């Protein structure tokens, strides 16, 4: 089949083409089906984020070519159904009961048709019931989403992806999963996320435009617009915000939040830590309760910790600050100045012990 052009007709359903289902707009779902069927998708107006093109320009572009005019926001239309329609040699309509979902044929013939009064000369092609639901309200959006979820999940399982509970797994049509990865119950794989072979994601995990490397474990966590290297473990309850790059064999533990930071190979941030606007090298140990103090109320500053350093529990790193290679920061310190390589820093008050203080207070009736 020769390449064809597709167009959506704006009008009463414009806002429904914009509705998001499984992390994509209705239009984007339809455009993916058109692309898989061998067509090119364009827009008459700003129905969604796609390329804008006027009807006149589209007529010129499609001169002599076949045109698919999508009339209803039926996000569950499949490439197979569109191919079945486009295989017709004559002007045809894809219908579901009295509703016309799409028109097919030469540009002049298609644009001249009134969908509400199709002549008998236009061939009718019946759409599958599960594909013909137009998205017009939350209830229909849910029904369509369920169809898309089943279709997408089944497709990935047939390619060798393990979905422990397909009923609670939602995968964007833009996501890429390698055979041999595993998604546990409650996974939301949104946007252009990728999951490599051997990775185990979930349960109850959100990936949005995230890249998860081979043999990673991401447990009950959220990762957005970030990359996780091979063999790294994340979670439970980690929050990786946009702009993070995590190396291989690293550990991002429970209640750790990362933002706009790089973490080197083999570095361990095991629990209860905030790392923001920072560059951490390789083989660093970050203790419990460490905080990068990166915001002064007006601007944000970066923190650098070089390879093989040790950051003790409850250390505050006041940015901008640089910790040299192989340094040791004792627990409880607030670091405000750069630390040279292989230095030991203790930045806390010396403890004062007052013997028998409690006993004396009790004898005096003050406790």
Where are these regions (language model features)?
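Structural signal for interior beta-strand "rungs" in well-ordered beta-sheet cores
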Residues: 162-347, 351-352
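Terminal amphipathic alpha-helical/low-complexity segments used for targeting or macromolecular assembly
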Residues: 1-167, 173, 180, 341-343, ...
């Amino acid at each position: 089949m020769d390449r064809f052009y597709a167009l959506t007709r704006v009008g009463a359903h414009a806002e429904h083409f914009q509705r998001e289902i499984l992390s994509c707009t209705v239009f984007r779902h339809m455009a993916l089906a058109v692309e898989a069927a061998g067509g090119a998708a364009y827009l008459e107006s700003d129905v969604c984020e796609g390329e804008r093109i006027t009807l006149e320009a589209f007529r010129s572009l499609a001169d002599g070519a076949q045109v698919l005019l999508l009339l209803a926001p039926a996000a569950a239309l499949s490439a197979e159904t569109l191919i079945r329609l486009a295989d017709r040699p004559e002007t045809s309509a894809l219908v579901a009961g009295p509703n016309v979902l799409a028109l097919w044929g030469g540009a002049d013939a298609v644009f001249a048709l009134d969908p509400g009064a199709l002549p008998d000369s236009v061939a009718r092609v019946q759409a599958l019931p599960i594909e013909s639901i137009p998205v017009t309200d939350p209830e229909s959006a849910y029904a369509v989403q369920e169809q898309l979820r089943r279709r997408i999940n089944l497709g990935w399982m047939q390619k060798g992806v393990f979905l422990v509970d397909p009923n609670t797994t939602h995968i964007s049509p833009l996501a890429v999963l390698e055979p041999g990865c595993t998604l546990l119950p409650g996974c939301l794989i949104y946007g252009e996320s990728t999951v490599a072979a051997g990775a185990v994601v979930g349960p109850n995990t959100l990936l949005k435009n995230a890249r998860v490397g081979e043999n990673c474990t991401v447990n009950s966590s959220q990762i957005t617009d970030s990359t996780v290297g091979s063999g790294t473990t994340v979670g439970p309850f980690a929050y990786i915000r946009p702009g993070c790059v995590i190396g291989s064999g690293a550990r991002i533990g429970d209640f750790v939040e990362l933002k706009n930071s790089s973490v080197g190979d083999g570095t361990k941030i095991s629990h209860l830590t905030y790392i923001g606007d920072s560059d951490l090298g390789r083989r660093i140990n970050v203790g419990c309760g460490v905080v990068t103090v990166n915001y002064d109320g007006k601007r944000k500053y970066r923190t650098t910790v070089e390879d093989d350093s040790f950051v003790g529990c409850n250390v505050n790193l006041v940015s901008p600050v640089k910790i040299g290679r192989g340094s040791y920061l004792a627990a409880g310190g607030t670091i405000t100045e750069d630390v040279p390589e292989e230095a030991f820093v203790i930045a806390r008050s010396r403890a004062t012990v007052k013997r028998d203080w409690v006993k004396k207070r009790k004898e005096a009736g003050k406790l």
